[in-house]
A protein has these predicted regions:
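Short S/T/G/P-rich N-terminal loop/turn motif that feeds into the first structured element of a domain
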Residues: 1-65, 79-80, 103-133
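Ligand-binding pocket scaffold of soluble enzyme catalytic domains
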Residues: 69
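An amphipathic, aromatic/His-enriched active-site/gating alpha helix that lines ligand/cofactor pockets
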Residues: 75-104
Length: 133
């Protein structure tokens, strides 16, 4: 299992943070390389996005499963990130890449730490399941 946590912009005086966790099972080995390339592009986008406090990535390459956990200073900035490139392209392509169980969940937190146990627990009742082919 590979895991990475990155602090982008500490939360300072912010009282409530917006957290989003995703589980991204990839349905075929042929999509792994394109997915990893896209992940690197989106990671660069994350590091330059205002309003992001921190993010974490987790990978179980053997089972083609990937997780993300992002912590945002305000919910409003998330939409700008999601609809900007390259993330917007990743969303379009994910309908082809997604395996069974791909989902995300949102919640608010006062500490906004990268807590994988909490994220995994919350993903048991996701906000949204991606439709798979």
């Amino acid at each position: 299992m590979v895991e990475r946590k990155v602090e982008v912009d500490g939360n300072g005086e912010i009282q409530e943070l917006h957290c989003i966790a995703t589980i991204l099972p990839i349905r075929s080995w042929r999509y792994i390389i394109p997915f990893l390339r896209m992940t690197a592009r989106v990671q660069k986008q994350l590091e330059h996005t205002r309003g992001l406090a921190r993010y974490g990535l987790k990978a179980d390459l053997l089972h083609k499963r990937f997780w993300t956990l992002t912590v945002w200073q305000k919910k409003e900035v998330v939409q700008g990130f999601v609809t900007s490139e390259p993330h917007a392209e990743a969303v379009r392509r994910f309908k082809d890449w997604a395996g069974e169980g791909a989902a995300f969940v949102e919640w608010t937190s006062t500490n906004g730490t990268i807590d994988w146990n909490t994220a995994m627990q919350k993903l048991q009742n996701p906000t949204f399941y991606y439709k798979t082919k």
